Regions:
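Extracellular domains of the immunoglobulin superfamily
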Residues: 1-209
């Protein structure tokens, strides 16, 4: 009796090994798990310890199949709107019908509100020629954004990777209106422009004797 039980258990173990593999998928979200309507979102099914083999990927949203249900590429992309909010998971299957586990679910939240930054200046108020004014584009957002700066007109821009921009006041013409906005992803998703900030240049800095 003991021998029969042992053989039965070994048979179950062998059958389990044939139908599944010890590969652990992880869903990665680009650019972030919190995005805005109109952003392009990319989901990647990263199968850890999956080996150098060809996988077919199955995708699930809130536990249900998600279009495209099965793909040969590890990535899928879509232009997000509120209907895409939910919990996403994936699973891999090899050509020999062996399957990975299903990944843990990752939550994607899509907001309908397009963010609008606030532009501030330091020092605030009037500026003197010869001085430097630091502009800051303030937003309550996650890292990974680039920032775009506009002087006098919205037709030309300067791009930075940080949310601050130093303006050297060389002459009265450096005064006037300034704006900023942020962007991320490919294609770039832009926030709204900030309200215009007026930099008033009043005169020259006093020079010490």
């Amino acid at each position: 009796m003991s021998l029969r039980v042992m053989i039965f258990n070994v048979s179950i173990f062998t059958l389990k090994c044939i139908n599944s593999v010890e590969a652990k998928p992880v869903v990665k979200v680009t650019p972030d798990q919190r995005v805005f309507r109109g952003e392009t979102v990319t989901l990647t099914c990263d199968i850890q310890r999956g080996g150098n083999v060809q996988w077919t990927y199955s995708w699930f949203k809130d536990g249900n199949t998600f279009y495209p249900y099965r793909t040969t590429a590890a990535e899928i992309s879509f232009r997000a709107d509120e209907s895409y909010s939910g919990k996403y998971s994936c699973r891999g299957e090899r050509s020999d019908s062996q399957r990975s586990d299903t990944s843990a679910a990752v939550t994607l939240t899509v907001s309908d509100l397009k963010p609008k930054p606030e532009l501030t200046a330091d020092p605030a108020g009037a500026a003197l020629t010869g001085n430097t004014v630091t502009l800051t584009c303030r937003m309550d957002l996650s890292p990974g954004w680039d920032f775009y700066w506009y002087k006098h007109t919205l037709n030309s821009e300067t791009k930075t990777e940080t949310n601050s921009y130093r303006v050297k006041i060389d002459s009265v013409s450096d005064g006037g209106q300034y704006w900023c906005r942020a962007g991320r992803g490919k294609p770039v998703y832009y926030t709204q422009h900030s309200d215009a900030l007026w930099v008033n240049v009043t005169g020259e800095r006093e020079h010490s004797m």
